[in-house]
Amino acid sequence: LRFAYESFSIKPAAILILQILFFVQDSFMQQAAEFQIQDGQLLGARQIPSPNFNQRPEYTDIQLLVIHNISLPPSLFGGGYIEQFFQNQLDWSVHPYFQTIEGMQVSAHLLILRSGEVLQFVNFNDRAWHAGRSSYLAKKECNDYSIGIELEGSDDLPFEQAQYDALVKVTACLQDYYPKLQQHIAGHSDIAPGRKTDPGPYFDWCAFRAQLQHYKNP
């Protein structure tokens, strides 16, 4: 009787442990499944195709993730101007600043809005026009072998936590699919020093890397 009682009393604890393990595993799988890559598309991102891209050089591996910031007009958010800019649909007459970038044709693979929503403009298999004249570890033309992520923001304002959360999830997904990205993440200012300053002093690299590490190893 004592053995039977002890065996019975152990079961609820064992069941509780199993439930916790299944919950943790299920939560992790749900997080991992939030973004997936299929044929160069980021599933879970809103697709807004940009005409500003070309083919990567043949046999080029994706090996660098570049983080930028952008706001149109500078330090003002919302309005959809970034999306219009990347699609060559921006009305240059709307704001005086737009006239200073009139005719420019640029893009990024991804844009993370202040709300944390992720937009994809260029397929990862293609070469987005985000880096310009650039070099990383003595290798020039970073557009050839990188993925560019724009954060809606500016050098003089903090980013939103929702943007860090989305960036962490997207980065983890990209690193899983493109293993070389695990060791190679840079800011635009790192690959174009003296020419570019983004993502700027308000981008918290330490917090981003710590959150990414915790997300990948909960």
Task: Enumerate the predicted regions with their spans.
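Conserved, mostly hydrophobic/aromatic
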Residues: I149
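Basic/polar, cationic surfaces and motifs that engage anionic cell-wall
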Residues: Q30-Q41, K140-Y145, S154-P218
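Residue-level marker of positions within ordered structural domains that often coincide
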Residues: I10-I15, L72, S115, S154, ...
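N-terminal catalytic cores of peptidoglycan-degrading enzymes
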Residues: F23-K140
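Short, Lys/Arg-enriched N-terminal segments with co-localized hydrophobic residues
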Residues: F8-F28
